A protein has these predicted regions:
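Long, contiguous binding/interaction regions
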Residues: 1-54, 58-196
């Protein structure tokens, strides 16, 4: 059914495969606007097919309207395929870049917190550091909240990207790797084939 927020609006996550040509995003945004649906998050990028792009939307709106948006998107000529993955078993991530004030006194603590959260420091200046945070929304929100005490100068977030989990992945059920990571699997497969 999707998330229903405190304000009564519903939130759905949609993934669309669309033709990679000018005006497609504008047509899709217009469709959302006409139906009174807010695009809370949007990520667009090249897909595995050269002439197609993949879009991930997080749409917010009236529950009766937002629940049907995938059907309306599917009617657009440029949309090859659309899926509502709100209730599906998916892996999703978001990326944020956050510039935080970091004086000589506060810098060690800022870096310590970044390490605890497995956050990358991608730029260091005289009075600030820029962090790259990848994860779910809760992780990013938590890190930004923690950094507020030092002074958050700028935040830039991507939209959510999502992909259906693989069925019956090694070491777990429905795409969960368990203790065996992808690099371990590649190393083991390389040893078995003699290519490592």
């Amino acid at each position: 059914m999707g998330d229903v927020m405190a304000n009564g609006l519903a939130r759905r996550t949609l993934v669309a495969l669309v033709e990679n040509k000018p005006g497609v995003l504008a047509r899709i945004a217009s469709l959302f606007r006409r139906r009174g649906i807010n695009i809370a998050s949007l990520a667009v990028g090249a897909s595995e097919q050269k002439h197609l792009s993949r879009m991930t939307f997080v749409a917010e709106g009236d529950p009766s309207t937002v629940g049907h948006i995938a059907k309306h998107l599917d009617k657009l000529i440029e949309v090859v395929e659309v899926s509502d993955i709100t209730d599906a078993n998916v892996v999703w991530r978001e990326l944020a870049m956050v510039r935080v004030r970091a004086t000589q006194e506060s810098r060690p603590r800022v870096i310590q917190l970044a390490n605890i959260f497995r956050v990358s420091i991608v730029d260091v200046g005289a009075e600030a550091v820029t962090m790259e945070i990848t994860g779910d929304t809760a992780k990013i929100d938590s890190m930004i909240t923690l950094m507020a005490e030092f002074g958050v100068e700028q935040v830039m977030r991507t939209g959510r990207v999502a992909m259906l989990r693989s069925a019956l992945a090694p070491g777990g059920e429905d795409g969960e790797f368990g203790a065996e990571t992808a690099s371990n699997i590649q190393t083991r497969e390389g040893l078995e084939s003699g290519s490592v």
